[in-house]
Amino acid sequence: MKNIRKTHPLIKIINHSFIDLPTPSNISAWWNFGSLLGVCLGIQILTGLFLAMHYTSDTMTAFSSVTHICRDVNYGWLIRYMHANGASMFFICLFLHVGRGIYYGSCLFTETWNIGIILLFAVMATAFMGYVLPWGQMSFWGATVITNLLSAIPYIGTTLVEWIWGGFSVDKATLTRFFAFHFILPFIITALVMVHLLFLHETGSNNPSGINSDSDKIPFHPYFTIKDILGFLLLISFMMSLVLFSPDLLGDPDNYTPANPLNTPPHIKPEWYFLFAYAILRSIPNKLGGVLALVFSILILALFPLLQLSKQRSMMFRPISQCMFWILTADLLTLTWIGGQPVEHPFIIIGQVASILYFLNILVMLPMASLLENKLLKW
């Protein structure tokens, strides 16, 4: 009798994806972030489901329903803060996962990479809409400012914004539809994750050396299941430390004030994981130009497979490219810092320089470093 794991139509798929999957023997801890993102998604869907049981998407009661969850629901405070900080964990893992893809040349799996970019946009949209739901000051004004950016689109902009709002301002209709989309998107993300994995398993995983590893593969289970479980434990430990010791560390105090359309907060800023893009948006004086720069700051990831001019896939043995990569990382951290600062000197000029460096690094410096290293190979 053959093993059910290898014959059952459904279990067979799981077996080929997580158990008997041939995996390069030398993949490092940087390859853990895919599974960690899966865990984050699972945590977010579960905690979100329980929050949705008690939340009301009405402008009059949304804020007090969140207060009710934190005060009156059994472990409601825990579920709420796990959901809020789970989003931060999600983005930390996302950024590291994308960074790994760039550093080790995994972006050359173009289908997997492009689905990943769509996933990134979907997760960002979900996080943005989720931030609006508690209906605090920053929720309301964040929603107003970000949706208003679409009015920069020529001719149809204003109509488009009012269509998204469901009226002439961010109000009940906006909150209700944002809740609906915030609920449905994670399930769309789950479906996209399956497509992402489908394309990945067509080619097999990359590895740190960037060299074909068909001659040295080992089964995913037990070697990498154990390795992934260690990652899960570290992630959950870090997340629960944040939730239980300083749950509001990454949040904005303004969001503990109920939304008031008549009172604008002094500094409107999104959650920390959007600050780099927000800094790029603010660094351009023209509205449409800023919106385009904002979109292209993420969309530029789609160009990475085309800008890979090196004869070597991975950056592991390319010190000049490594240098450019870490300059890019430092630049993104600088942009994140600037995004949270008020619009005044010297922050304006730092933001503008960092924004130029961001695009310059990706479009010019990294490809030139690759070409230079190709020349050095001939010496």
Curated annotation (Swiss-Prot):
GO molecular function: metal ion binding; ubiquinol-cytochrome-c reductase activity
Keyword terms: Electron transport, Heme, Iron, Membrane, Metal-binding, Mitochondrion, Mitochondrion inner membrane, Respiratory chain, Transmembrane, Transmembrane helix, Transport, Ubiquinone
Gene Ontology cellular-component annotations: mitochondrial inner membrane; respiratory chain complex III
Domain of life of the organism encoding this protein: Eukaryota
Gene Ontology biological-process annotations: mitochondrial electron transport, ubiquinol to cytochrome c
Assembly description: The cytochrome bc1 complex contains 11 subunits: 3 respiratory subunits (MT-CYB, CYC1 and UQCRFS1), 2 core proteins (UQCRC1 and UQCRC2) and 6 low-molecular weight proteins (UQCRH/QCR6, UQCRB/QCR7, UQCRQ/QCR8, UQCR10/QCR9, UQCR11/QCR10 and a cleavage product of UQCRFS1). This cytochrome bc1 complex then forms a dimer.
Name of the featured protein: Cytochrome b
Organism: Eliomys quercinus
Gene from which the chain derives: MT-CYB
